Design a protein with these regions (language model features):
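Periplasmic-binding protein-like
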Residues: 132-139, 237-257
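Short helix-initiation/N-cap motifs at beta->coil->alpha
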Residues: 53-63, 150-178
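Gram-negative bacterial Sec-dependent N-terminal signal peptides
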Residues: 1-19
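Short, well-ordered beta-strand elements
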Residues: 20-30, 48-54, 121-122
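Ligand-binding "clamshell"
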Residues: 83-95, 110, 182, 187, ...
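Beta->alpha turn/N-cap motifs
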Residues: 54-58, 68, 72-82, 98-99, ...
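A bilobed periplasmic-binding-protein/Venus flytrap-type ligand-binding module shared by bacterial periplasmic
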Residues: 102-113, 215-227
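A conserved helix-loop-strand patch within extracytoplasmic ligand-binding domains
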Residues: 95-144, 243
Length: 258
């Protein structure tokens, strides 16, 4: 982690002399980096050099932007951003919404949710917003009932009815695809599912509705969001070109939200 932070710091310092023309953004590989690569040439033609730093966790992209090591990030949905700001008191600011990644239930051991046995172990993300989102999906699938059926911040302690006595195991989101051989099922964010070679539309036994409120957003800090280059990036990301790329590349597993 220290090595990665040092590399981000070095990257930020190396571009500081040309900040007006260089825009730095941290992103998780799939689909975020892939989407950013689509608009890179368009920004280049406008004199903007988009530098992308890849991350594989849900914390460092925000701290890097908050600490002014990067201008922007693109990896999280709105509820996660709101939760992070509340917990850390940072000056992160949403720039705009780009897409939705419906979260899904995956398993290497069963072919249908009705095949789940009593006491089965289900892995979910351990961060508050994605954990709550996973529990809401289990509730929608009819496997559990929550004390507050609409709470996006629910935890396993908020489960009111659990007829199968499911064992809810909380893991770091990037670890969930690797856990499939060890658990009966896992609820996995689409970016990590795709990155692991899973097809959300074919492999998920149950998937979130496409009208989910969990829109993935580009995020900056109070200084970076004032840059004209950030406005240019958002315009490029919310273009027909990007919408077509999302539709063609992900075939419904990722849905444009603009």
């Amino acid at each position: 982690m220290k090595k990665l932070l040092l590399s981000v710091a070095a990257l930020a310092l190396s571009f500081s002399s040309n900040a007006a023309e260089t825009l730095t953004i941290g992103a998780t590989p799939v689909p975020h980096v892939e989407i950013l690569e689509v608009v890179k040439p368009d920004l280049k033609s406008q004199g903007i050099d988009l530098k992308i730093v890849e991350f594989n966790d849900y914390v460092q992209p925000n701290t890097s932007v908050s600490d002014k090591l990067l201008d922007l990030n693109f990896f999280q949905h709105r509820p996660y951003l709101d939760s992070f700001i509340k917990d850390h008191g940072s000056d992160l600011v949403e720039v705009g919404g780009i897409h939705i990644e419906p979260i899904g239930f995956y398993s290497h051991k069963i072919k249908d949710l009705k095949d789940l046995k009593k006491g089965a172990t289900i892995a979910i993300p351990n961060d508050p917003t994605n954990g709550g989102r996973a529990l809401l999906l289990l509730q929608t699938a009819g496997l559990i009932t929550l004390e507050d059926p609409k709470s996006i911040s629910a935890t396993p302690l908020d489960i009111k009815d659990n007829k199968l006595n499911l064992n809810i195991k909380e893991l770091e989101a990037p670890q969930l695809p690797r856990s499939l051989d060890d658990v009966d099922g896992a609820i996995i964010n689409t970016n990590y599912a795709i990155d692991a070679g899973l097809n959300p539309l074919k492999d998920a036994l149950f998937i979130e509705n496409a009208d989910s409120p969990y829109v993935n957003v580009v995020v900056g800090n109070s200084q970076s969001v004032k840059k004209d280059s950030v406005k240019a990036l958002l315009k490029a990301l919310q273009s027909d070109k990007v919408k077509k790329f999302i539709n063609d590349k992900y075939n419904g597993a990722v849905v444009a939200a603009f």
